[in-house]
């Protein structure tokens, strides 16, 4: 019996072929795999907006200035939101990584409870490893053919290892005067240029010059490595004399370089990895004495 009521006819519309097809597919899938949940269709609520060349240039400039501070990048670009900027940045970083281009990619920001906060600082263990005990030279004294350092050289090595700067008068004695006092109570200071070649002279007032004379020598330019390594070689030469006099006559930068290398040498020689080399030296010395006899 067909209803003649027009309202009822509008409420029950005729089923289209598309709806019938979707219903059939859903019923078939449900019958084959009833335990599988049907995923909800993904709908794009907002269309993606393309980036203009000017906006992309602003984005690249903001990356150089603010790294991954998206809020500041948003304010700098002006026409994009943080969500759009982060999405654009993700695609840009993947493109750079894929193409291997030399572009600025800021490092990822640290997590709140990161084990190594960004930027990473030098660990305390690495700094503590430099402060080694002065008992190591006594172990080195047992090496064949080794001449013990005198008291002055041992004191300098103690300065290098401990990192403790001696009083001003002792430092002046070791490094020499850095400034010269003229006859008119004017002090002339000579310092190397930034490139390490040549020097520049200027005259200072009495009060300012005296303050500079009491300060520790500044490190400028490059050390004379020939002089530095010649001195370190003389430390192991039993016939070498006047080592302290050579140290006093050195430039401050050469003096500091000698202390640094002697400290590193002390640490390396005291390393357990050096023991096989020490045993080899002992065996070679015994073999040499046997052949000589």
Curated annotation (Swiss-Prot):
What does induction of this protein depend on? Circadian-regulation. Peak of expression in the afternoon, and lower levels in darkness.
CDD domains associated with the record = SANT (cd00167)
Q: What is this protein called?
A: Protein REVEILLE 4
Which keywords are on file for this protein?
Cytoplasm, DNA-binding, Nucleus, Transcription, Transcription regulation
UniProt subunit comment: Interacts with LNK1 and LNK2.
State the SMART domains in the record: SANT
InterPro entries, per the entry: Homeodomain-like_sf, Myb_dom, Myb_dom_plants, SANT/Myb, SANT_dom
Instruction: Name a single GO biological process.
Output: regulation of leaf development
State whether keyword DNA-binding applies.
yes
Q: Give the UniProt entry's GO cellular component terms.
A: cytoplasm; nucleus
HTH myb-type domain sequence ranges: 43-97
């Amino acid at each position: 019996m067909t209803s003649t009521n027009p309202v009822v006819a509008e409420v029950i519309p005729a089923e289209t072929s598309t709806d019938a097809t979707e219903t059939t597919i859903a019923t078939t899938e449900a019958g084959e795999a009833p335990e599988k949940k049907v995923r909800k269709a993904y709908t794009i609520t907002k269309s993606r907006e393309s980036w203009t060349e000017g906006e992309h240039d602003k984005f690249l400039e903001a990356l150089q200035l603010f790294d991954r501070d998206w809020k500041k990048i948003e304010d700098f670009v002006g026409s994009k939101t943080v969500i759009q900027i982060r999405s654009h940045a993700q695609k840009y970083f993947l493109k750079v990584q894929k193409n291997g281009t030399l572009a600025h990619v800021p490092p990822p920001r640290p997590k709140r409870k990161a084990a190594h906060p960004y930027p990473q600082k030098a660990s305390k263990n690495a700094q503590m490893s430099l402060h080694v005990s002065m008992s190591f030279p006594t172990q080195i004294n047992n090496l064949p053919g080794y001449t013990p350092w005198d008291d002055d050289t041992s004191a300098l090595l103690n300065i290098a290892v401990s990192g403790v700067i001696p009083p001003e008068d002792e430092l002046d004695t070791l490094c020499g005067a850095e400034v010269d006092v003229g006859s008119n109570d004017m002090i002339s200071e000579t310092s190397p240029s930034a490139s390490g070649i040549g020097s520049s002279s200027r005259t200072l007032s009495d009060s300012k010059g005296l303050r500079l004379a009491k300060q520790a020598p500044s490190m400028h330019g490059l050390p004379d490595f020939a002089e530095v390594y010649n001195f370190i070689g003389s430390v192991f030469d039993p016939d070498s004399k006047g080592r302290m006099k050579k140290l006093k006559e050195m430039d401050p930068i050469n003096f500091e370089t000698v202390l640094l290398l002697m400290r590193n040498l002390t640490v390396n020689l005291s390393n357990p990895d050096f023991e096989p080399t020490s045993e080899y030296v002992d065996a070679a010395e015994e073999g040499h004495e046997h052949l000589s006899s």
